[in-house]
């Protein structure tokens, strides 16, 4: 059973303590009512993993843990088998005592694009919305963050995060909660809020931006990464039934339109810091994610288009401040 008691104890002593008015009841309800049919199997996998204190831990350049003495072949095989029980692995990569988890996404590429434009993360309390398996939270800790809190309702991601945490010596500087942002009160407590790969899945993108703003302290920083299309400040794509085979894509604005949306929600100092086309080198099928990936979602005769005929995925990073 995954226990959230450590997180409750941690925030009871800091400026997130008011979250305890609602959070334990929400988590208790989730534990009682909303667990996935495979959750017990996934959480048992986490239980079976050894808790190892890394001799060398690198979260600054990667997510890499090494022991002082190499693990035996049997120990490595056990860890690899258990981690494979938590497939598919989408966000990473992770290198854990000789087990190299080559995830669908090279999430380190995205981090390298984002990091140079961030305010110094040293000592910051961070919220990562739609955090997946938590890869970027560990990189935030590596960049000096005091505490990284991730929210993502996908329960496999929670178990993947807890598995990695256990292999990082039960590190308590990052925590993942199985919630969506709509379940959070207006905490106004985070120095930096990340929303990466979420906005286009929201039926009301401006409401999402307001929800992000409600989590920030005054003068806090928003890091927004999402799909965009080419065009002026009035250009927005509303896909039909699917976009790149995804059913739940609602609005894809141009970067300039997105900048206007942020302005409309009261953000200031809005910057478009990166725009790049997603390549099949960055997102692809691997041994750790064996189903369809980006190459299957693009027109085989024209990779500049999706199979539905829309522009192929292009992503922008915008940074803004809450006044």
Swiss-Prot record:
Keywords: Transferase, tRNA processing. Signal peptide: none annotated. One of its GO terms (molecular function) is transferase activity, transferring alkyl or aryl (other than methyl) groups. SUPFAM superfamilies: S-adenosyl-L-methionine-dependent methyltransferases. Homotetramer. Belongs to the class I-like SAM-binding methyltransferase superfamily. CmoB family. This is tRNA U34 carboxymethyltransferase. It comes from Shigella flexneri.
């Amino acid at each position: 059973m995954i226990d959230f008691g450590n997180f409750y104890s941690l925030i009871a002593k800091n400026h997130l303590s008011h979250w305890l008015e609602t959070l334990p009841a929400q988590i208790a309800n989730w534990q009682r009512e909303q667990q996935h049919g495979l959750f017990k199997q996934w959480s048992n996998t986490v239980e079976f993993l050894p808790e190892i204190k890394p001799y060398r831990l690198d979260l600054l350049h990667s997510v890499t843990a090494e022991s002082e003495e190499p693990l035996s072949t049997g120990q490595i095989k056990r860890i690899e088998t258990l981690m494979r029980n938590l497939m598919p692995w989408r966000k990473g990569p992770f290198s854990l005592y000789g087990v190299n988890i080559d995830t669908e996404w090279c999430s380190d590429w995205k981090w390298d694009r984002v990091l140079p434009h961030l305010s110094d993360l040293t000592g910051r309390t961070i919220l990562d919305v739609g955090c997946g398996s938590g890869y970027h939270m560990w990189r935030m800790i590596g960049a000096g963050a005091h505490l990284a809190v991730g929210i993502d309702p996908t329960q496999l991601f929670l178990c993947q995060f807890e598995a990695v945490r256990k292999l990082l010596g039960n590190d308590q500087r990052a925590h993942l909660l199985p919630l969506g942002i709509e379940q959070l009160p207006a905490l106004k407590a985070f120095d930096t809020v990340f929303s990466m790969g979420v906005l286009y899945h929201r039926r009301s993108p401006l409401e999402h931006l307001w929800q992000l703003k409600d989590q920030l302290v005054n003068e806090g920083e928003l890091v927004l990464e999402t799909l965009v299309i080419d065009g002026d400040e009035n250009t927005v794509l509303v896909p039909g039934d699917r976009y790149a085979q995804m059913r739940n894509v609602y609005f894809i604005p141009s970067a300039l339109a997105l900048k206007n949306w942020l302005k409309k929600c009261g953000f200031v100092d809005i910057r478009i810091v990166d725009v790049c086309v997603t390549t099949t080198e960055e997102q692809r099928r691997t041994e750790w994610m064996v189903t369809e990936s980006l190459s299957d979602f693009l027109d085989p005769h024209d990779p500049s288009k999706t199979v539905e005929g829309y522009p192929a995925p292009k992503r922008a990073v915008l940074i803004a401040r809450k006044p």
